[in-house]
Amino acid sequence: MSEFNFISRLHNRGLISHITNEDNLSKLIENKSISLYCGFDPTEESLHIGHLLPLIMLKRFQIAGHRPIILIGGATSLIGDPSFKEKERVFNSNYNVNIWTEKITKQISCFLDFNCGKNSAVLLNNNTWFKQINILSFLRDVGKYFSVNTMINRAAVKQRITRPDQGISFTEFSYNLLQAYDFFILNQQYQVDLQIGGADQWGNISSGMHLIHRKTKRVVYGLTVPLLIQSNGIKFGKTESGTVWLDSNKTSPYKFYQFWMNIEDANVYYFLKLFTFIKVSEINKLEKNKNINNQIINDKSLLAKHITQLVHGKEKLLAAERITKFLFLKNTTHIEESDLQQLKQDGIPFIEVSNVKDLQEALVLTSLAQSRTQAKNMIISNSISINTEKIRKNHIFHEKDKLFGKFTLLSRGKKQHSLLCW
């Protein structure tokens, strides 16, 4: 197999966890444009960064000339995928699923090109076909092709069945068949030859391939991207403050940008290969020079920049960079009023004030100091800044301290901040 073909390039970036019939799939996609799909169940009002790799994989295939199909699980989300879940999901209402579907559809739309000719992206909802099938038809036309013994022994289900405190309901157990039917319908109606997903979807993808082969004798393919786990064993994208969402109203572009700036050093160059479109040869050069002048910090910034722009766009990336420079590089030149409003929304402690006179009082009010005495000592020890400027003696506030006439940023060291809102 040529080292320059598409599948080899995906391997070179570490993007493939599982793949079926690799040689045949590689020949297929080198010789013609194929249709592939990935499903997303709207079980929340936003996707999170755990969904990024499959989305970016679809984008890579589209750039290579193939047609990506996004399948929104309007029906399957009413059941919930039990794969590797420790306990049964809480059912979502039709009302919530419909609202979440609209929101997630808008999020996904910015990743792919829906107007580029023959390989334009397609957006579908599996509720379209599931609302037309009855239970007896489904059991006769789909269920008869599956062995319960095989289904029980799939790793995604087995861990639930073997736990004494948790079983699995027939409802969740049937999810595997529903997703298999999705693949079958897409193969029949949209000529889909490949399903992609996260590594935890391998069992569901395999079931779809099995169903298609049993019913039609056709050969189709599956490919999964790796599941990313942090060194503490927690899934990538989970932080102490919660999930990192793609929706800017749930995780601001600034917080999103900072998440990537704070990843473990060991992951920087791997993630550049996974999440960006920078050439592997260029990434390897960056890694070779990572210890020169602390270059790895710049490389983290490069990663954060590429992914933030991909998810949130250029304008919100620039705002995230302005806030970062303001807080960490003491650069107030280009800060905008909306950036400070964003800081307030992002959870930086703030208090509404009107008649605070001096810095010591403000430090106590914001809990950056426990007493005026402690505040005085912190000021003397050069630990306190006003709008990123170090203060060495008690300070009486003036209008010039109020950015845009409204905000004063107090900082204790590099990481503790509080915003005075006048």
UniProtKB/Swiss-Prot annotation:
Signal peptide: none annotated. Keywords: Aminoacyl-tRNA synthetase, ATP-binding, Cytoplasm, Ligase, Nucleotide-binding, Protein biosynthesis, RNA-binding. Residues 357-414 form the S4 RNA-binding domain. GO terms for biological process: tyrosyl-tRNA aminoacylation. L-tyrosine binds at residues 37, 175, 179. It catalyses: tRNA(Tyr) + L-tyrosine + ATP = L-tyrosyl-tRNA(Tyr) + AMP + diphosphate + H(+). This is Tyrosine--tRNA ligase. It comes from Buchnera aphidicola subsp. Acyrthosiphon pisum (strain Tuc7). The gene is tyrS.
